[in-house]
C-alpha cells in the first residue's frame, strides 16, 4: 500500500472506503521507497482465526516441492509445453513429502486449484490482484488436499496432493527460531554451533552482504536424511591445543574422522565418543582441523 506507516501502527486496521481490508504489518525501511507499507490481507486473517479454533497452531501447509519460473521460450519447448501453456518447473521433490511419488523433477505445474499459473509463477487471485502461486497453497490448512494440474513430457494430468504442516525448513539452514535456548558445543577451546538464520542475522540488518559467503551459500542447499543440518566452528579460543587455528572462524564442518556430519547432535556424539588419538575435522574443500583428543577434553 502507498501509505506512511509509523512505529506503533502494526496491528492496526487498514481502512479503505470505510471498510477494514486488512491489518497493518510493517513499513519498508530500506530507504529505497517512501510511504510504502505492507498489510495482512483478509484471506490470511481468516486462515489464522480458523486455525486457532481448536487451540492448536498448525500454521500454513507445505507440499514438499520447489520450483523455478519458465520465462524462457526454449525451456517451455524443452519441457513439452504448447504455446498456450504456462507454469512453473519442479526442480526438487523432498523425501517423505506429500509430493514424493506423485510429482517428479522436470514436471511443469500448470495450475493449483482453479488458478492458472503464469510463466513468472504468478496467479490471478482476483480481477485486480496478481500474486505468487504459493498463495493458493497457503489458502489451505494442513491435512487438506490441493488440486494440482501438471504436465510431464507433454502429457497433462491432475492430482490431489494432501498437504502437511510446514516443516521448519527444507534448507540446510534452518529458519529463525524464538523462545528456544541456543545449542552449542565446546571442544578443545573451539565453539561449535548449528547453522541457522539466528546465527546469520548476527551480522546485522545488512546480513545478506556482511555475513560470510560460505554461510550464505548454504541457504541454497537442500537437506536430506543423510545431511539434515550444518555445523559451524564459530570461534577458536587461543590455547596450546588449538595452536595453528587461532584465526579460524565461521568454518563449516563437513566430516569428522572421514564420516559425514548428519546434524548437530550427530556431530556432538562423534566428538564425544571419538576412539582415536586425534580428531580430524574437514570442510568440503578438504581443509582439515586436527586436535589431540586427550588434550582437547582435558
Give the ranges of each region predicted by the language model:
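Active-site loop architecture of trypsin-fold serine endopeptidases
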Residues: 1-11, 15, 20-46, 115-125
